[in-house]
Amino acid sequence: MSIHIVALGNEGDTFHQDNRPSGLIRTYLGRSPLVSGDESSLLLNAASTVARPVFTEYQASAFGNVKLVVHDCPVWDIFDSDWYTSRNLIGGADIIVIKYNVNDKFSFHEVKDNYIPVIKRALNSVPVIIAAVGTRQNEELPCTCPLCTSDRGSCVSTTEGIQLAKELGATYLELHSLDDFYIGKYFGGVLEYFMIQALNQKTSEKMKKRKMSNSFHGIRPPQLEQPEKMPVLKAEASHYNSDLNNLLFCCQCVDVVFYNPNLKKVVEAHKIVLCAVSHVFMLLFNVKSPTDIQDSSIIRTTQDLFAINRDTAFPGASHESSGNPPLRVIVKDALFCSCLSDILRFIYSGAFQWEELEEDIRKKLKDSGDVSNVIEKVKCILKTPGKINCLRNCKTYQARKPLWFYNTSLKFFLNKPMLADVVFEIQGTTVPAHRAILVARCEVMAAMFNGNYMEAKSVLIPVYGVSKETFLSFLEYLYTDSCCPAGIFQAMCLLICAEMYQVSRLQHICELFIITQLQSMPSRELASMNLDIVDLLKKAKFHHSDCLSTWLLHFIATNYLIFSQKPEFQDLSVEERSFVEKHRWPSNMYLKQLAEYRKYIHSRKCRCLVM
């Protein structure tokens, strides 16, 4: 017998005395007297083997002979990129633990607004524990105004934690530190209570099944075999960060050039990427005005570091293209300018690798004061208007998702004319876009804009065979690396669009979405739905979606009694029909045995255990 625990969220950086990373779950497993196995044997998937693991799996023995399996998911990426795995994790859990750091209010609200609704839909009457970890720092006096209580201070209040627990029907715990009292007696006591409850429930269900099997001593009914295992689709890893990083090195679609104070060319870049991470560049490139930003430090940083040069007498200006030459920007600070190529590489890589940036700057600037000065200027460039600079602790920021800037900020420019240099014409309407992002994220677009094609020199580009809604969803994926189709039909349209532009990862995402939607449908809904599953299969085959077409064939075979009654079942090819008949569930042999058993039961006037 086993117990499956899923732990979600990041309680903050905690360390053993020998500086090995630890946390709430690992500390409990290492200290609890009910859990056997030394600490080194608990970890199955070591974090060192993967750059940013989705989850860490632990296995141990509890209560002597009960297998304990724990999946610790410190980041929430799994809910953004992999519906299939996240749904299976939540659905298969016996106990769920949601943990957060009381001093990270931004992450708490991000989780509460974006991920808690997803978890609520996937919960299956399992106990949930909300663990608020840490001692509140710089906690302000509570405000009596009912309109601002939840936003007061920089810490997550007890009231907010309790409110979250009420939404999930969860047990709320405050763990001020990860010591023996809070881990062993407080958190451990509650967790072990729910573990015992889960064991009791599983034992009761097992006894009921055994009692039913022993209650009949006559001829046994035919055994219904399990359906064949469905093919498992593995999601393709994201290369979003590397796509944007490669854009800096390939120098395609450049629209801004930086010069040093001596008017010598330093590096080329792209306005859209710079504006996605920095309000300083938004102000510099007139995407936003000082009135929009209303932050004196950002305005001062822009004025102190950069100046735009539009002088026609500028060296090399006569050789620039007459169409739309790159914007010339003078970097006023000589030290900052000498490190600009490293700073841009840091920004294009996701703006989170602070240690690497500092190491690169130290190689160029020997004086530690100069290094600190340049690092502070980078932090000012990345500052959010109206807020205290949250990047002062680089180590804390480095623990965040590397795509934190791009995923949210590039969406700001989606279907907006700001900085747009290409316009798509679809179904009589226009959709503005940015060549740099399209070239970086889509090889077909890169070939189209850089080859000897009409689109390379044209601003207005017509798009055929795709609806506006589908194309906007396609662009949303290119800009943000994520998408959420409204349903199976839209997902298939998006899959076709992805195949047309050869974006394989988006195809896999659409395949997983369709599979997840179909798997979640009960039999009654499958029988009554208007979706033509055979037509879906033929489209998947036509557009080279081999994984989806294979899965759909198994799905039709597994639900044979439902789909064989539908008219479209006759549209299957001879080869497809043969496959379905071979792998059908329940099998034809079982149905014959069941008919004979029912005939015997009725002749004996016994009570049938199956029907």
From Swiss-Prot:
InterPro entries on file: BTB/POZ_dom, P-loop_NTPase, SKP1/BTB/POZ_sf, Small_GTPase
Enzyme type, top EC level: hydrolase
Pfam families xref list: BTB, Ras
GO CC field: cytoplasm; cytosol; extracellular exosome; trans-Golgi network membrane
Record-listed E.C. numbers: 3.6.1.-
Region (Rho-like): 1-175
Result of altering residue 138 to D: Abolishes ATP-binding
UniProt keyword list: ATP-binding, Golgi apparatus, Hydrolase, Nucleotide-binding, Repeat, Transport
GO molecular function, one term: ubiquitin protein ligase binding
One annotated GO biological process: proteasome-mediated ubiquitin-dependent protein catabolic process
Boundaries of every BTB domain copy: 254-356, 420-487
Domain notes: Although predicted to be a GTP-binding protein because of the presence of a Rho-like region, binds and hydrolyzes ATP. In contrast to Rho-like proteins, the conserved Asp residue in position 138 in the G4 region is replaced by an Asn, decreasing the ability to bind GTP.
Record text on subunit structure and interactions: Interacts with RAB9A and RAB9B (at lower level compared to RAB9A-binding). Interacts with M6PRBP1/TIP47.
Function according to Swiss-Prot or TrEMBL: Rab9-regulated ATPase required for endosome to Golgi transport. Involved in transport vesicle docking at the Golgi complex, possibly by participating in release M6PRBP1/TIP47 from vesicles to permit their efficient docking and fusion at the Golgi. Specifically binds Rab9, but not other Rab proteins. Has low intrinsic ATPase activity due to autoinhibition, which is relieved by Rab9.
Protein name: Rho-related BTB domain-containing protein 3
Organism in which the protein naturally occurs: Homo sapiens (Human)
Organismal lineage: Eukaryota, Metazoa, Chordata, Craniata, Vertebrata
Gene that this polypeptide is encoded by: RHOBTB3
